[in-house]
Curated annotation (Swiss-Prot):
This protein's name: Crossover junction endodeoxyribonuclease RuvC
Source organism superkingdom: Bacteria
Chain segments annotated as coiled-coil in the UniProt record: none
E.C. number(s) listed in UniProt: 3.1.21.10
HAMAP family: RuvC
Molecular-function GO terms, alphabetical: crossover junction DNA endonuclease activity; DNA binding; magnesium ion binding
The record's free-text note on cofactor binding: Binds 2 Mg(2+) ion per subunit.
Quaternary structure and interacting proteins, as annotated: Homodimer which binds Holliday junction (HJ) DNA. The HJ becomes 2-fold symmetrical on binding to RuvC with unstacked arms; it has a different conformation from HJ DNA in complex with RuvA. In the full resolvosome a probable DNA-RuvA(4)-RuvB(12)-RuvC(2) complex forms which resolves the HJ.
Database matches in Pfam families: RuvC
Described purpose of this protein according to its UniProt entry: The RuvA-RuvB-RuvC complex processes Holliday junction (HJ) DNA during genetic recombination and DNA repair. Endonuclease that resolves HJ intermediates. Cleaves cruciform DNA by making single-stranded nicks across the HJ at symmetrical positions within the homologous arms, yielding a 5'-phosphate and a 3'-hydroxyl group; requires a central core of homology in the junction. The consensus cleavage sequence is 5'-(A/T)TT(C/G)-3'. Cleavage occurs on the 3'-side of the TT dinucleotide at the point of strand exchange.
Positions of the catalytic residues: D8, E67, D139
């Protein structure tokens, strides 16, 4: 049994999703969004750190997975996203959680079956996979997708006799 916290980072909205993995089953535990209220980036980063630290205390996850930074057309947006990821990763490492990173393509492939899936397709598949009464909000669905991707990656590696490691899957120690 493992509880996985998945995070879809953003400087304004950071989605989180928690699943409990029992054998080959993934059970929905909780999800939501941390919406930052300040216009000043340092205060938004603190809100992300504090919010995820509280979520970690509440759900007591065993593992933490986060979406990797993608290349953005706007360099300023990419930098802010990277800083939001940093705040999230520090919250995880402060709680001694192993951190794994996955690209958007890996996440979409694990959830939908194609790396070019639309957000609405991810929402629909997360609803189906986790047997939810309705589709979660987009950022929360993406975060649940990160957790599902991490579960499937570890299941595949376990079948081959291993687990995600720091070189291959971007874990921090």
């Amino acid at each position: 049994m493992a509880i996985i916290l998945g995070v879809d980072p953003g400087s304004r909205i950071t989605g989180y999703g928690v699943i409990n993995c029992v054998g080959r089953q993934q059970v929905y535990v909780g999800s939501g969004c941390i919406r930052t209220s300040s216009d000043e980036l340092p205060l938004r980063l603190k809100q992300i750190f504090d919010g995820l630290s509280e979520i970690i205390r509440q759900y007591q996850p065993d593992e933490f997975a986060i979406e990797r930074v993608f290349m953005a057309k706007n360099a300023d947006s990419a930098l802010k996203l990277g800083q939001a990821r940093g705040a999230a990763i520090v919250a995880a490492t402060a709680a001694n959680l192993p951190v794994a990173e996955y690209s958007a393509t890996q996440i979409k492939s694990a959830v939908v079956g194609t790396g070019r899936a639309q957000k609405s397709q991810v929402q629909h598949m997360i609803q189906q996979l986790l047997k939810l009464p309705s589709a979660p909000q987009a950022d929360a669905a993406d975060a649940l997708g990160v957790a599902v991707c991490h579960y499937h990656t570890n299941q595949s590696l376990a079948a081959m006799g291993g687990r995600a490691n720091s070189r291959t899957y971007g874990r921090y120690k």
